[in-house]
Amino acid sequence: MNLILMGLPGAGKGTQAEQIVAKYNIPHISTGDMFRAAMKAETEMGLQAKSFIDKGALVPDEVTIGIVRERLSQEDCVRGFLLDGFPRTVAQASALEEIMKDLGKKIDYVLNINVDSGLLLKRLTGRRICKECGATYHLEFNPPAKADVCDKCGGELYQRSDDNEETVANRLDVNIKQTKPLLDFYEELGYLQSINGEQDINKVFADIDVLIGGLA
């Protein structure tokens, strides 16, 4: 099963990715992990990526795509994979189609975890972190027993500056604009599957499981 996982910040992608790879024993391939592994192994593309990163420059598409090609050609991807964080653009998605064709494979589903942006705003702005021990809470979904006080160490809880409403709203807006062309691209190819991410996390996974179970 060859899957791509999509969703806006706060949609719960990480939780669902963990459950998918645990049940189906396929590698969870995130862009960051791919780059780190390629640079550590000193592959041709990894060394090229390192030369850009060391200069503080953006890694060009052809290098990123080369790293994806190297990674998807590895033995642990024979039974499938879960791509997370790639592709980000229609150009990258088109390049991925070519890679899959060359490998004699195809993308089975693009799973888009759908959550209303108002609910995402609530999820993302409700996070609170302990100044002392770093424990994470949520005002609505995982509140501390006593307001603004850490259950574990009694430290003071604070909101990160990038979790404030204006910053989060801007981040969501940028993400929505960036991902729409990609969602349209995959809808046209017939790969796109919309998953209701507003349910309980176990129900979200149950819906994904029903969809992808037949691919195993």
From Swiss-Prot:
Family annotation (InterPro entries): Adenyl_kin_sub, Adenylat/UMP-CMP_kin, Adenylat_kinase_CS, Adenylate_kinase_lid-dom, P-loop_NTPase
Catalyses which reaction(s): AMP + ATP = 2 ADP
EC number: 2.7.4.3
Disulphide bond pairs: none
Compartments where located: Cytoplasm
Top-level taxon: Bacteria
Listed SUPFAM superfamilies: P-loop containing nucleoside triphosphate hydrolases (SSF52540)
Pathway: Purine metabolism; AMP biosynthesis via salvage pathway; AMP from ADP: step 1/1
Chain positions recorded as Zn(2+) binding sites: C130, C133, C150, C153
Pfam families: ADK, ADK_lid
A GO cellular component annotation in the UniProt record: cytoplasm
Region (NMP): 30-59
Residue sites binding AMP per the record: T31, R36, A57, L58, V59, G85, F86, P87, R88, Q92, R160, R171
Domain notes: Consists of three domains, a large central CORE domain and two small peripheral domains, NMPbind and LID, which undergo movements during catalysis. The LID domain closes over the site of phosphoryl transfer upon ATP binding. Assembling and dissambling the active center during each catalytic cycle provides an effective means to prevent ATP hydrolysis. Some bacteria have evolved a zinc-coordinating structure that stabilizes the LID domain.
NCBIfam families (alphabetical): adk, PRK00279.1-2, PRK00279.1-3, PRK14527.1
Name assigned to this protein: Adenylate kinase
Organism listed in the record: Bacillus cereus (strain AH187)
